């Protein structure tokens, strides 16, 4: 509280940033230890968590007051007009301090108290068991074993304690390979496909330079290849552009020399580094925040940002992994520079395409814990949790979530969770409300004692499971083991509900999923009414349903009233302003064709015609 100079300011205006006539709401601004709160004259509340604030800008004084612009990491932008410059200056300085903490213990997670006891807290952290996940894959087995070489984090500080390696890999081979890899991140198992033994492994770039080699590293890659008896070769996928990898050779790093490694096939996939991605997102946000752009100007700005091209590059790399494993039955080793950014993206998305379990709500949590949290994606640096180097901030995990969202658009029946689930996870990688995403590796999290001092996000999401369920999800999709998305350019869309989720005045739309969920609720109510009517009919000796008996069955039921009037109503009346429903075009909603090994895109699910939602085949 020592950073808060002014706790309350009245007559503050909240501007609508897309209004052409400076439309605004007048209310009171409150500053607390954790949130900035605005309450307008109608008692509507706008809460902004301090940790969500990316930047605060105090503009030049105007005749109506002092402007204060706040940009948030969850893409909310708020524009306040504070009547007095002194109050604006106090709030500005307070937010600069409160939004950038110097140490982890000052983050919200360490003071957040959801009224759970220690047992509930412990059970929440035990919800995800990675040892059980590897057992689900059939590991350990005849070819793969659990190694204790990193039990004390002596081999690699940014890897988990438990590493799965080929059974033929000895401890000297593991240690030697670690010494030859950047940050000690040696090749280890990420995913094993049951029934074929083809595997996804991950590591960092080798310290090969132009001519250096390491026999232990060569032996480890050979052991990974032999752990898959179904194929005599394996792929090594370098996720960087080739020029970047060549440049790293001059610094004593680089990529594997195929002459030194037997039975490997090398592949570059060309995903740009964190600095390019950060710049691309900034360009995208500049386009999003511009007022009065024409449609052509918006699409031109979206194209020049390069954001969707980067999303496509990440998905293409994941598709390469899936095809190598399914079509060629080949194992794949993935790396970038240090193996915690692009490597996490590609390994997790490849696993998602291959394994339907990861497309369930619980499985998706397991996937994030396995390929992102346990393998040391630097969440705190990439999300700017602390006041650190801004050059380390990059939307790597945001890109992963956006790739998943694009998959849900092409395969709406294949995912148990909906868009709101992805948005909520994105909200909490920045909120610092839960301990899951704090720190940069498992060792650091253990030192912070996060499981004792903070709470896990996952049980809270599962408690609200109904809110995040996808009404289109089909259990039949569990039989579909592999997704093959189409990455033609027309399949990539601007994720409006991510980047404009707080701009309610900007072309308001009702989502197709919301419509279908409402239709499901109506159907359930009608089924209950039918059961009650059937029970009442049985009680009638002559089988005649009297008017009094009708009113005894849910007299207030809108569905029943409609049925009794013998009208042919619309399933869901939609106002003219809601006819433009996102995802209602043929390119937006697709079913899956399960007749083939890889699924394909399918025809429209829901269309709107004359204000009526209809199912189409």
UniProtKB/Swiss-Prot annotation:
Active-site residues (renumbered): 336
Q: How does it sit in the membrane?
A: Peripheral membrane protein
SUPFAM superfamilies listed in its UniProt record: (Phosphotyrosine protein) phosphatases II, PH domain-like
Give all Phosphoserine modified positions: 557, 585, 607
Q: In which tissues is it expressed?
A: Isoform 1: Ubiquitously expressed including in heart, brain, spleen, lung, liver, muscle, kidney and testis (at protein level). Isoform 2: Expressed in testis (at protein level).
Where does the Myotubularin phosphatase domain lie? 124-499
Q: What is its EC number?
A: 3.1.3.95
* Residues that bear Phosphotyrosine: 108
Q: Where is this protein localized, as stated in its record?
A: Cytoplasm; Endoplasmic reticulum-Golgi intermediate compartment; Cell projection, Ruffle membrane; Endoplasmic reticulum
Presence of the UniProt keyword Kinase in the record: no
Region span, Interaction with RAB1B: 2-141
* Principal subcellular localization: cytoplasm
Q: What is known of its domains?
A: The GRAM domain is required for cell membrane localization. The C-terminus domain (aa 502-617) mediates interaction with MTMR9.
Tell me the function of this protein: Binds with high affinity to phosphatidylinositol 3,5-bisphosphate (PtdIns(3,5)P2) but also to phosphatidylinositol 3-phosphate (PtdIns(3)P), phosphatidylinositol 4-phosphate (PtdIns(4)P), and phosphatidylinositol 5-phosphate (PtdIns(5)P), phosphatidic acid and phosphatidylserine. Negatively regulates ER-Golgi protein transport.
| UniProt record similarity statement | Belongs to the protein-tyrosine phosphatase family. Non-receptor class myotubularin subfamily.
Q: What is this protein called?
A: Phosphatidylinositol-3,5-bisphosphate 3-phosphatase MTMR6
**Protein species of origin:** Mus musculus (Mouse)
